[in-house]
Amino acid sequence: MKKNSFKFMEWAFLSFQFLTIIPIKAKWSVSENDIARSAMFFPLAGAFQGLILSLSCLTLNLFFSSSLTGGIIVLIYILLNGGFHLDGLSDTCDALSVKSTGNKAYDREQRLRVMGDSATGAIGATAICLAILLKYLFIKELFV
């Protein structure tokens, strides 16, 4: 039983390592199965990030305007997860912008190629800008 509880701890640490920039170094061997199993702890990592952002928001709002608080919170959010979600949003939007040729196999291959490309396209950049703007506006609205 002790070995299983240690595995759960490993998986929890892996989820934080994957979804945040919190420096958790794995001092054990990590298998593909371990990485897959860590997904069960993704909500925990998300709740932790949400707690940090909520406490930061409440604290900052005591000292700054809602506009400045919103901007700082968006910055903390991006820094906390290393822009991981924005990169995924950008890649997805770029892939969805690939025009269809009618050949499903070819279109799928092209979309996967675009998603794998490290360059950000116009649609991806627009999606990032809109996502950041909307996050800022939603946070600002909380304190009006």
Language model regions located:
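Hydrophobic "anchor" residues on beta-strands that sit immediately upstream
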Residues: 87
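Hydrophobic alpha-helical transmembrane segments
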Residues: 1-82, 90-109, 117-144
